[in-house]
Regions:
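Hinge/lid segment of periplasmic solute-binding proteins
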Residues: 105-123, 129
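N-terminal secretory/targeting leader peptides
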Residues: 1-100, 120-315
Length: 315
């Protein structure tokens, strides 16, 4: 934290937070809620300043800024801590969760706690998961079975896991920048995209890929990371308040994202999109070898996998 002094001489600790989306995004709103509540609960001793829209740089560099003390917190993809500890691959593994609620229950159950604290040796800690929604496939035809994906070129993030996932699902993955997807679909360079309903609608991909099929291959976790210097600088009482508000903000974000998905679907349907609901088990079975490989890479990942499965059965 940096420190400011008010006109009446009180010290205010500034919590600097980086985020790559705009102020309308559910993740921004959840972080704003956390900051406002913490400021109120500490009688103004802490104030959160959020830098949205990626103004402080690429998400991949945020962990380094936090490690050096240039930032206190950030919302980043799970691939960022995975760069420090490969066990984080399990958190965003294909077909690990049934839906966003399953990911929420897993996060709040404490299933990730051991893994999340493991990065303290790198001077940052993962505090919680914020969802970025469920990723599904969209194309100019409905996708009901893995056979429907045969030979189709599907745009994915630049990730070995994503490329392998599409291969197991029956298609051919190709990495491509999000900004290029609309034109690539329009020109037939790719046959399909895969992302959340928000992205599908915000980028107007329904204009070039009418069918949005709920393959539900990824329930997307982003993570909130924080500097250990910032966390350790808090008193025990303030830290207890902060931890409670982090959990509250997790619930807030999942609820807000679910609401935004419904709005995105209505918008897409009004513009001619057709939502398709295949049997996801057909795709899950195809991807099971990939999930087994990721979940079996260490004792930590095995424990997390077992906890996730137990929570599935408790539903």
């Amino acid at each position: 934290c940096s420190t400011n002094t008010t006109a009446d001489g009180h010290e205010v600790k500034i919590i600097r937070v980086a985020f790559n989306q705009n102020e309308e995004h559910p993740q921004y709103k959840a972080m704003r809620e956390l900051g406002d509540k913490f400021e109120e609960a500490t009688n103004g001793r802490y104030k959160m300043v959020i830098y949205p829209n990626g103004v402080l740089g690429e998400q991949g560099s945020m962990a380094e800024f936090i490690r050096t003390g240039a930032l206190d917190m950030a919302i980043v993809p799970c691939s960022v801590p995975e760069g420090y500890d490969s066990d984080f691959a399990i958190v965003g593994a294909p077909y690990l969760y049934d839906d966003m609620d399953h990911l929420r229950r897993t996060t709040l159950s404490g299933a990730f706690d051991e893994l999340f604290k493991s990065t303290r040796k790198f001077n940052f800690e993962v505090l919680t998961v914020y969802t970025a929604g469920e990723r599904n496939i969209y194309a100019n035809k409905p996708i009901n079975t893995p056979d429907d994906l045969k030979g189709m070129i599907v745009r994915v993030n630049d990730s070995t896991t994503y490329l392998n996932m599409v291969k197991y699902m029956g298609g051919v993955g190709t990495a491509m920048s999000q900004s290029e997807v609309y034109t690539a679909l329009q020109q037939g360079v790719i046959d399909a995209g895969e992302n959340s309903e928000r992205v599908y609608t915000d980028f107007k991909h329904y204009e070039v890929a009418k069918y949005y099929s709920y393959t539900k291959h990824i329930v997307h976790p982003d993570v909130v990371i924080a500097s250990t210097n910032f966390l350790d600088s808090m008193s025990a009482a303030d830290k207890e308040i902060f931890d409670k508000l982090v959990a509250d903000s997790t619930d807030y974000e999942f609820d807000a994202f679910a609401e935004s998905v419904q709005e995105a679907k209505k918008d897409a349907e009004a513009n001619g999109a057709i939502f398709v609901y295949p049997d996801t088990e057909l795709f899950r079975e195809k991807c099971q070898p990939l999930l087994d490989s990721i979940s079996g890479q260490s004792e930590v990942t095995k424990k997390i996998y077992d906890k996730v499965q137990a929570l599935r059965e408790e539903k």
